[in-house]
């Protein structure tokens, strides 16, 4: 009876279901970005099944038909398909305390695209052409520490351990803390930035205090790419890809790179070795110099 009271939803009220889903994801300490993704996927699914009186009455065949229609029409990527199926499974688990078998709906083949990255020369141009001290500090921190956008925005002043030469990154993806090195060049820039802007809690704060916004960082990078005349498109995550790629190109052990990036599985890190393999293919043969 307790389970019925706790998990049963008398009608297909998407708003209540999504609100409850969010609360239970929060209770399980999922990251903010993960919760938003789960909710977005769940919302799309709930619109499709709104004709049913409750979640419990949706047949698995209709869930399969929903995913199949998306795939057959070429409307979704492999990663989107994985996310959609995963969100539906998680919603049933947390809302109805029910594990549904949907593994056969996951794509079996992975068509991973090689991540885009900036060349070392492009990174140098981006930083050299960024005159605003705060903007330069932000871009330099992303690249020199291989940070995700959320990790950058969550950095606090106390996380910068200048005496130890490290930066502590709290509750990154997978809810695991990690430590990255604090390069001397970055430390010098951050000291100048701190003296000029005097942030109170977060390393990078908005005009009225509090966390700097995602949109602001994205605009900073966009303008920096234009000023540096970098033709290739790039996002904040491209800075992280560049960090990883340049480390491996410099001969840093893949296992160390894995820890620095905060990857749970080394297979995720291995994608960067494919990029360096392409570079090796471009290496001239000694015959070319004869």
Annotated model-derived regions:
Residues 1-290:
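Conserved catalytic core of the tyrosine transesterase superfamily
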């Amino acid at each position: 009876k307790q389970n019925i009271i706790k998990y049963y939803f008398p009608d297909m009220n998407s708003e209540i279901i999504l609100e409850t889903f969010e609360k239970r994801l929060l209770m399980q300490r999922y990251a903010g970005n993960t919760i938003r993704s789960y909710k977005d996927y769940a919302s799309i699914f709930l619109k499709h099944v709104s004709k049913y009186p409750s979640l419990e009455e949706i047949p698995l065949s209709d869930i399969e038909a929903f995913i199949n229609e998306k795939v057959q029409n070429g409307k979704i990527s492999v990663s989107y398909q994985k996310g959609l199926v995963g969100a539906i499974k998680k919603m049933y688990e947390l809302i109805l305390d029910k594990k549904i078998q949907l593994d056969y709906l996951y794509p079996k083949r992975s068509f991973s695209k090689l991540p885009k990255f900036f060349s070392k020369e492009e990174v140098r141009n981006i930083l050299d052409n960024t005159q605003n001290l705060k903007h330069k500090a932000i871009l330099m921190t992303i690249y020199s520490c291989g940070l995700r956008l959320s990790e950058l925005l969550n950095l606090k002043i106390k996380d910068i351990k200048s005496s130890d030469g490290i930066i502590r990154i709290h509750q990154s993806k997978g809810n695991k803390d990690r430590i990255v090195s604090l390069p001397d060049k970055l430390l010098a820039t951050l000291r100048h930035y701190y003296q000029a802007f005097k942030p109170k809690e977060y390393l990078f704060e908005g005009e009225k205090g509090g966390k700097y916004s995602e949109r602001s960082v994205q605009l900073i990078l966009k303008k920096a790419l234009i000023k540096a005349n970098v033709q290739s498109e790039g996002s904040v995550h491209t800075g992280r890809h560049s960090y990883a790629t340049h480390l491996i190109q410099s001969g840093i052990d893949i296992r160390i790179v894995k820890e620095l990036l905060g990857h749970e599985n080394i297979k995720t890190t291995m994608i960067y070795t494919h990029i360096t393999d392409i570079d090796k293919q471009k290496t001239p043969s000694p015959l070319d110099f004869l």
